[in-house]
Amino acid sequence: MNTRLIAIVLGLTTITAQAQKPAIPRDAALEAKVEKKLAKMTLDEKIGQMLELNLDVMGKMTVENAKVDREKVRSVLQQYGRSDAEVKATLKMTDQEIIDKLGGFPVDIYQGDTKRLWKLNETMLDTLISKWKVGSILNAPGTRAPSVDQWLQWIGLIQEKSMKYLGIPDIYGLDHNHGVTYTQGGTLFPQPINMGATFNTELVKRGAEITAYESRAANCPWVYNPVVDLSRDPRWARVYESFGEDAIVNSKMVVAEIKGYQGDDPNHIDRFRVGTSTKHYFAYGAPWTGKDRTPAYLSPQMIREKYFEPFKQAALAGTLTMMVNSSSINGVPVHASYEYLTKWLKEDLQWDGFLVTDWADINNLFSREKVAKDKKDAIRIAINAGIDMSMDPYSVEFCILLKELVEEGKVPMSRIDDAVRRILRAKYRLGLFDEPNTGGKGFEKFGCDEFAAASLKAAEESEVLLKNEGNILPLAKGKKILLTGPNANQMRCLHGGWSYTWQGSKAEDLSEKYNTIYEALCNKYGRENIILE
């Protein structure tokens, strides 16, 4: 009797698995192209597709008219927790010594008339693509927003080299996660926490459409968005990056945003749309300590019903890729979890997109989590668990070590082929083989008034009135208004992170035509009526 019952249960499980339709319906012609390309690739070419490098390694930041601002140096060092002794010693250095020490980092240590210019090293780029077969590049140089023309030049050259040496286009990725945050002159939208507060999926979809258009205007086909980390702990520094704490809201918003970014057919994404990388799969927004990239401890029910659900909906909506949680869930690093990466996502949902790590996260399996003895062992664990692409920003060591693992039989060739098949599929779906570059003609609406109006509407609908004692709002003209607080006259607080620079630290320089809260109140009520303290 028990044997028969087990057999029936197993049979039902098999039938259920077989009945699960692919999250993205397969296109036979596209799949044939993927298989044909895959069959012609060498092991080196396949492994190169699985590596994503930071653009900074292909160029150099030069400084003209360099003059160090020592108060900025002091502030930067204190911000990053350096000791008083190190701060004191650094301030005694010459300007050039300070530049040599700190100039390579995305921090502002210069006086106002200093110019920082990033130059692409074509020889280095040539080597990385011709020798190491690198298939993906990311980021803005120095994490500071370039112009559209600069993006067209740099990504255009990357695609030229990729097609010349590999016959496979690069898939370039940027954190364009509340508008084109890494492109000057484009449209910034309110942060996702604001977009969630609108409860308006049409606004979210329209914002994604505009961001996709302006990303492609800058020749970028892939964005690291949407973010659907349930933000349930106000201590967590990245609450603003998601749609909030509710699984239903995040699920509804992520579907709308994916449709806006990618269009209605994920197999055929047109030149005005981009591929999405829904992140951070999953439970990244539930750190036990409240600090970023720290462990989550959750019940199985909470994991399945709440934290997994928005990602399930993203997969079913056709997101091309997902970025993985940097930390661990109940003691298991997500980058090492076959159950989470392969079974739940790729097998149970029949999702055929690819999984990319976050910044250098495979390294954490040995350096922080201690589940691997060294980097090579960490690569073995992560790739076998289901990671398809490693964001290993500064080194090609990944390629060397993964090849050794394949030759030693520790990573099966079938796993390599599966990963590369998924990456090629995404590139075909984006139309990159037919049109590696976009931008220029057809993208004249970049940064237009229509797009700005859509952003303003989203900002207005996101406003939540918490208190209005004595009906003081709306403010009457002709009265004195006290405005106080550290953010009252700063632009950075209005944008938040991922705004022109990684932490939004250069927002003042790149948003001069806009107003701070103080400036806006002065314009409306008269400077003589505003008291700033």
State where each predicted segment sits:
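Glycoside hydrolase catalytic-domain context in secreted enzymes
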Residues: 18-533
